[in-house]
Regions:
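C-terminal catalytic "cap/lid" subdomain
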Residues: 1-251
Length: 251
């Protein structure tokens, strides 16, 4: 595939800082990197699918996310390298219908090959794992909720004591500017201090920060985070014209 650009036509003005149905003041992201877009696609951004941008990443072809209902809008441009942004995050995504699986095995966790045996069970059931947290005697994992969890748990019970709890959701904040910045995690969890957080993760890429909460708390968490991190958006990265128009009406 050789092309100058790939156009993806959707029903929104490109990638947004959050789901506009949850945050009416969500902003259009003007430009974002392939790496950042791939993270958002995996963690639930509705306008992208991971397989959609993979060929473009491999060929270094820019991707344009445009609105078929508003073709004059510039949309979002996805490029190989991220443009510098003074804001730590570009967007907030949420992935619902997840289940936390907890395994406790005080004797076996330290034995050689234990984690391999656990993940082999998930592989046998073709069950992808989103997040993993381990301690001396336990493992917590998150998976998509499905009807086969009882069978999965039954097989895992041969390795450990197993419990699982559904109706969870993953909140993911994505931005290349969080690398090496002090205090970002403190700001994130201060913004959601009124919400119970079950698991926390920062990816090896260091461009995303994720945590698990109850599904019922998703909208409140996204709105709180958006209010905390997009109060003074970088106009080079975000389309602030709509927000300025609303503010001028209220003056």
């Amino acid at each position: 595939m050789d092309a100058e650009a790939i156009e993806i036509w959707t029903d929104v003005n490109g990638i947004m800082t959050a789901d506009p149905r949850v945050c009416p003041d969500a902003l259009r992201v003007k430009t974002i990197s392939f790496e950042e877009a791939a993270e958002l696609a995996y963690f639930g951004a509705k306008v992208l699918h991971p397989a959609t941008i993979l060929p473009a990443v491999q060929k270094n072809i820019p991707v344009l996310v445009l609105n078929s209902r508003n073709p004059e809008n510039e949309g979002t441009r996805i490029t190989a390298l991220a443009t510098h942004c003074r804001s730590p995050f570009k967007s907030i995504a949420a992935k619902k219908r997840l289940t936390i699986v907890d395994l406790v095995a005080s004797r076996m966790l330290l034995s050689h090959g234990y984690l391999h045996a656990v993940f082999e069970v998930f592989d046998n059931h073709k069950c992808a794992v989103d997040m993993v947290s381990t301690s001396e005697v336990s493992i917590s994992l998150t998976v998509d909720s499905n009807d086969h969890l009882p069978e999965l748990a039954a097989e895992l019970s041969k390795l450990a004591d197993v419990t699982y709890e559904g109706r969870k959701a993953l909140i993911c904040l994505v931005g290349g500017n969080i690398r090496g910045q002090n205090g970002i995690a403190a700001q994130v969890f201060h913004a959601v201090r009124h919400i119970n957080v079950r698991m926390i993760s920062q990816g090896a890429s260091e461009i995303n920060m994720s945590f698990m909460i109850d599904e019922d708390d998703v909208d409140e968490a996204v709105r709180s985070l958006h209010a905390a991190f997009f109060v003074d958006p970088d106009p080079d990265i975000f389309d602030v014209t709509a927000r300025k128009a609303i503010e001028s009406v209220h003056l």
